[in-house]
Amino acid sequence: MYLAKMTTAQAKEAFEKDPIIVIPVGSTEQHGTQGALGTDFMVPSYLADHVEDVDNVIVAPTVPYGVCPYHLSFEGSINIGYEGLYMVLHGIMDSLMQHGETVL
């Protein structure tokens, strides 16, 4: 199940079953002249597509940012740094844990 497609009531019901939460993460960064900037987050999103219908699994929205300071000389690359990525993931996990989640 995709968290983003649920209503609040559906999420509450799903969270009561103590599901496994999958959080796809990947950078937006260059992959040469032939590769898409979103490759690093499209792959985990694709893999998440294959587990979203597994019983008791919830797929959280993909985090399309990461740490890539070495790619900043290439147009389109987005670096949020180690602290930024930590803060984003910590915020997501803290929010889910407020709803009783334990397996992330």
Question: Residue ranges of each PLM-predicted region?
Answer:
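Active-site and ligand/interface coordination hotspots across diverse enzymes
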Residues: 1-36
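Active-site histidine-anchored catalytic micro-motif
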Residues: 1-6, 69-104
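Solvent-exposed alpha-helices and their adjacent loops that cap or buttress functional pockets
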Residues: 12-16, 52, 97
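A generic structural signal for alpha->beta connector loops
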Residues: 19, 54-57
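Short beta-strand segments at enzyme active-site cores
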Residues: 23-24, 59-63, 103-104
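Glycine-rich loop at the start of a catalytic domain that most often binds anionic cofactors/ligands
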Residues: 34-41, 72-76
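Short catalytic helix/loop segments, enriched in acidic residues and glycine
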Residues: 38-53
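Short connector loops at secondary-structure junctions
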Residues: 57-72
